[in-house]
Structures are given as C-alpha cells and as structure tokens.
Regions:
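PLP-dependent aminotransferase class I/II
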Residues: 255-344
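A short helix->loop->beta-strand "cap" motif at the edges of active sites that frequently abuts
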Residues: 165, 222-225, 253-254
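Active-site phosphate-binding strand-loop segment of PLP-dependent enzymes
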Residues: 172-239
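Conserved PLP-binding catalytic core of the aspartate aminotransferase-like
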Residues: 321-322, 335-373
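N-terminal small-domain helix-loop-helix segment of the aminotransferase-like
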Residues: 34-127, 134, 308-311
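A short helix-loop-beta submotif of the ANL/AMP-binding
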Residues: 162-168
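Conserved PLP-anchoring active-site segment centered on the Schiff-base-forming lysine
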Residues: 138-160
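PLP-dependent enzyme catalytic core of the Aspartate aminotransferase-like
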Residues: 25-32, 106, 185-186, 359-360, ...
Length: 415
C-alpha cells in the first residue's frame, strides 16, 4: 500500500499524537493493512493459463486449453449483428429471454424425452462455470460435503470451498476412469449435500454408460442428496454412442441441476453463455443466487442463439468432432506415445510411462518439455487431482483446424 500523504484530506492512516520536546504535534504514519486471510490459499494461476502462456512464449502449437482455433458459423455472427441492430441491447429478463428457453426445452424433450417448463425450470447463465457456482451457492451450507470425481475439472473444488463446503474426492479408476461405486457409497455421510458428475468427461474423454447411470440412481435412491450434472460436451459423443443425460432418468432429474454450454456447442467459448435445467423448486433457489451473482446475460447473444438453434446444427457436432479426433489420431498413431481412447469431448490423452527416457519425469515437467523442445503444448492430467496424482498422462485438445492438428502431429512424431 502506498505511503499516505500528510494532510487532513488524504491521510487515511491512523493519526498518532506524540509529544516532542514538550510540544504536542500530530504526525501521520502509514500503518500497513494486514493481508486478508485467503479463502483459497492453495489456489494459484490455473494450469491452462500457464501452459497457454508457455505456448505463446516458445511458439508451440497450443493443444492445451480447450478452445477452437477456427471461426463459428457465419450465420451465427449475422444473427448476433441482427439482434444488436434490432435494438436488443438492454437488460433481458433475469432468467433469460423466453424464446431461448423455449428452444432449449424443445431440444431437451427431443433428445432426452424430458419436458422442462421454459418459464420456471430453465435459466440462462454466463457460461457453465457460473452455472456451477450458482448451483452450489444455492444448496451448499457451511460444512456440507460435496462428492466430486477425480480427475476433475479444476473449478469444482474452489467453488465448493468458496461456499463453505467440503469437497470429498471419489476416484475414477485409472486407466479406464470408471467410478468405483463401492467407494462412492463409503464416502456418503450425514453431511453429504450433493454429488457432482461430468459426462462426457473432461479431461479423460470418457462417457458414462447406462450401467453407471443406473448405479447412480441406486446410490441416491431414498436420500436427499442433490446432483449437479456438468454436460457441456453433451453433443460430442462418438462412435454411435448415446449421451446418457441425467434428463433421461426421472429419479435423477428430480434432484438435479443439469448444465450445458452454448459456447462449447457453437464454437463461441468467448461468448460465455450456457444454461441450467432443474425442477421448479430447485430453479427457484438457483435464481435467488443467480440474480446476485450475474443478474442476467448478454442480450443479443440470447436472441442470436435462439434463432440459430432452429437450424439444428448441434445434431452435426458428433460427426464434426469425431472427424477431428480421427484425423489427429491417424497422424500420431505411430508415435511413441500411447494414446488413450477418446469416447467424447474434444480431448484425447496420451501416456508416456513406457518410455524409458521420460518415465521418471513428472507429467508437469513432461508437458513443459513437449512445449519447449518439440513445440506442442498440452495439459498434465495431474492438474485435475487435488493431490497431483501422476499417471504420466497428458491431455491434448483436437478442437483445431486440420492444418493445426497436422503440424502438432508432425512435431509429436519426433518425441
């Protein structure tokens, strides 16, 4: 804190009267403010920011942070411009414009055979991370426990802690990353308030099958435990598989906040627009928090997306990203890295423990080595564990142009 000027208008430090040579004189001393106790003392710069900065520093192809390097559909941009020119530039309703919520309800009913009421059960949010924070704020009280599955997207734990909750870590068993339901059951306590799931899963690119959804149903039956389901990659499920949305399962949907992302679906991550589905009673609590966290969301984006949804392009996303996945893997399948299956999302992971020259290297160091020496940035999967569990695995994003993927692949072939 800067030294405070010594006059009555600008001196905000304490005034201390001293007696100097028997005369009373007032001097203004700067007394440093105590550093506040951090609510997140162990949280620093995210690995995504760090690796993207490193990629820029060394000129590496950035397959680390999950965003496309190609443009969205020009029709969506045109619809955004039309919305702004039509005067949709002031506050929309707190829950989002009704036409967009109606389009979401129609999509969900078509895909998952579950009817959400647009007025009272669908809320537009400023990205999926805000939706996650709002859902947790709505239901978590100090001391409540929230079970999350590791490896886990890095925002879950901090947001639980910011709300006074206690994260409880279940493990997706390496290398298949399937839940151990016996372990999950053992973690449930009288303080368990919610369970958070993510399918398709970031970072492992796995998708929960019907078997696991039924196991989750059985686990939660006859409990008052809430469910937060992060389904932002719902349209990126490959090889003919179906996305097992919580909305398909009435016994789960009745206790669930389901979150999805237009940014992911329409290649506009910078627009930060998503939505939350929940039964009316849960939505009421969600909106109580939502109105004071963000109040509402960018108006022209909502009108643009509402009109764009009618085109049905989300139905093409599975084929679009499966082609990207197959293109990339076809160019790296003969590399020394061992590539893990990618069943969904726009990520794929690779293992290197079998490589004698790298086996002793922590995955954080290996990721930095790939960026500095070979010119490809990725994300170490240990960053998705609270205790930095290291399975010698790194994650790559293939939401890129074919030219970008081909260049990255040619560099990885030299590892």
């Amino acid at each position: 804190m800067a030294v405070v000027a010594r006059n009555t208008r600008t001196c905000f430090a304490r005034r201390i009267r001293e007696v100097v040579y028997g005369l009373g004189k007032t001097r203004c001393y700067h007394i440093p403010m105590k550093t506040p106790a951090s609510k997140l003392p162990h949280v620093g710069t995210t690995i995504f920011t760090a690796m993207s900065a490193l990629a820029q520093e060394v000129g590496a192809v950035n397959l680390g942070q999950g965003f496309p390097d190609f443009e969205c559909d020009p029709r969506l941009i045109d619809l955004m411009n039309e919305a702004m020119r039509a005067g949709h530039n002031q506050y929309p309703p707190m829950a989002g414009i009704l036409p967009l919520r109606e389009m979401i309800a129609e999509k969900v009913a078509t895909l998952y055979m579950h009817c959400y009421e647009p007025a009272g059960e669908i809320t537009i949010t400023a990205g999926a991370t805000q939706a996650i924070q709002t859902a947790l704020t709505a239901i978590v009280h100090p001391g409540d426990e929230v079970i999350i599955f590791e490896p886990v997207y890095d925002s879950y734990e901090p947001v639980i802690r910011m709300n006074g909750g206690v994260p409880v870590f279940a493990t997706l068993k390496f290398p298949d990353y399937r839940p151990d339901w016996q372990q999950v059951r053992s973690l449930i306590s009288p303080r368990t308030r919610a369970i958070m799931i993510n399918t398709p899963h970031n970072p492992t690119a796995t998708c929960w099958p019907l078997e696991d959804m039924h196991a989750l149903e059985a686990l939660l039956r006859d409990t008052d435990i809430f469910l937060i389901s992060d389904e932002v990659y719902e349209h990126m499920v490959f090889d003919g598989a179906l996305h097992q949305s919580v909305a398909r399962f009435p016994a789960l949907a009745e206790r669930a906040f389901i979150i999805s992302s237009f940014g992911k679906t329409y290649h506009v991550t910078g627009w930060k627009i998503a939505y939350c589905l929940a039964p009316k009673a849960l939505t009421t609590e969600f909106r109580k928090a939502h109105q004071f966290i963000v109040f509402t969301v960018h108006t022209p984006s909502q009108y643009a997306i509402a009109n764009y949804m009618a085109l049905g392009t989300h139905n093409d996303l599975q084929q679009f990203y499966q082609a990207r996945r197959d293109f990339f893997l076809s160019h790296v399948e003969d590399s020394r890295l061992k590539w893990c299956p990618s069943h969904g999302t726009y990520f794929v992971s690779a293992q290197y423990a079998h490589l004698a020259d790298f086996a002793g290297m922590p995955d954080v160091d290996f990721a930095q080595h790939l960026a500095r020496k070979y010119g490809v940035a990725c994300i170490p999967v240990s960053a998705f564990y609270h205790d930095a569990t290291d399975h010698k695995t790194v994650r790559f994003c293939f939401a890129k142009r074919e030219a970008t993927l081909a260049e990255a692949a040619s560099r990885l072939m030299k590892v």
